[in-house]
Structure formats: structure tokens, C-alpha cells
UniProtKB/Swiss-Prot annotation:
Species whose genome carries this gene: Rhizobium etli
Pfam families documented for this protein: Autoind_synth
Reactions catalysed according to its record: a fatty acyl-[ACP] + S-adenosyl-L-methionine = an N-acyl-L-homoserine lactone + S-methyl-5'-thioadenosine + holo-[ACP] + H(+)
Transmembrane segments: none
Name the UniProt record assigns to this protein: Acyl-homoserine-lactone synthase
Family under the similarity heading: Belongs to the autoinducer synthase family.
Gene: raiI
Taxonomic superkingdom: Bacteria
The enzyme's E.C. designation: 2.3.1.184
Example GO biological process: quorum sensing
Keywords linked to the UniProt accession: Autoinducer synthesis, Nodulation, Quorum sensing, S-adenosyl-L-methionine, Transferase
Free-text function comment from the UniProt entry: Required for the synthesis of autoinducer molecules which bind to RaiR and that are involved in the restriction of nodule number.
Disulfide bonds: none
Amino acid sequence: MLRILTKDMLETDRRAFDEMFRARAAVFRDRLGWQVDVRDQWERDRYDEAEDPVYLVTQQPSGTLTGSLRLLPTTGATMLKSEFRHFFDQPIDVDSPTTWECTRFCLHPHAGDMKQSRAVATELLSGLCDLALDTGIENIVGVYDVAMVAVYRRIGWRPTPLARSRPEIGKLYVGLWDVTADNCRTLRANLSRLLEQASPYPARVLVDGGMR
């Protein structure tokens, strides 16, 4: 099940936000060792606090969240314009009301085994495509690890790479995902098939390499 969260829902749906921010701390700080700000077991940054992000989450019937991502309009403050800017030699000029940035792509500790984790990742991307299509967003921009290229291909929504990071940063790319009805249909069909099949990808690849 997919849900949309916005910052004004923090007090009325505190459980969902608590699970999401705790999961981000567990994955990004504890597992991956990223230098992120964690307070009271919540991983939040200035975009969560000062901007107006939209969050997309996957949820079990029990209410437990299994995955999440964050969306920000590129006409405002984004990580690509600031934190990620020094990763790339060439300037990445993405500033459009129809292009939104996706960051904090996270498979939560409750995502499950390998098959279930890949299903969560696919459900998040399928939901992202549908949400974007319904709201007039034409492109999604994000930073991803090279290890995710094969995963995106298998899921059925591959980005167009815009730039590659400097070697000392790692093997990161800025990519642009086209939002089209065909892509959304492909994602929905692949998700349906995936629910009946075993995943060829370990959950760790999906957690470690998704959109940052």
C-alpha cells in the first residue's frame, strides 16, 4: 500500500513520520555510515525542516512502513544545488516546475527478505511515476550509484545519465527519469509479476545504491 505524506501531517500522523525518520537513521547513519544529522533517533535535514517536501511511503496492512522517498521541486532548494553540487565537475542546471528531485530513497528495516525488498523498491518507483504523471511532473532527477543501473533496468524505469561524479567521490551519477504513461504502465506490470517471482537482486544492493 502506498501513502503520501506532507509536512503538515507531522502531528496528525506522527507514527508514520517516526518510523520513516528512524528508518532513515538506521539505514543512512548506522548501516551506510553517511554523515547525516540524527537527533532523538530521527534522521532529518534542512529540507525536511525548512522546505515543503512530499514523501511517498509503502505500508504493510498492519501500518508498519517498509520504504520511503522524498520529493522536492527543483525551483526551490535541493540537494543537487548544494550538497551534491561539488560531486560533479560540470554544472547541473536543473530548475523547472515540471522537474522534481527525489532523495532519501530508503528501504526500511521492515522491508523483508530479498523478494519483498525488491517489491518495495519497485512499488515506490511505480508509485512515484504514477504520482508524477497525475500531478503534471514530467521528470524526476536524482543522484544514484552505478550499481543501481541494472536494478533500474530490471524494474523498468531507467534514468538518462546527465553527469558522472569525480573519481574520488565514487561511481555516482545524476540521472533524469522521464515520466510517461508508458513507463508507469511498465512499472505496474513489472510490480505485478514481481509479487509472484523470486528476486535476483539482494536487498543490500537496493538499499545501498538508490537515489540519495
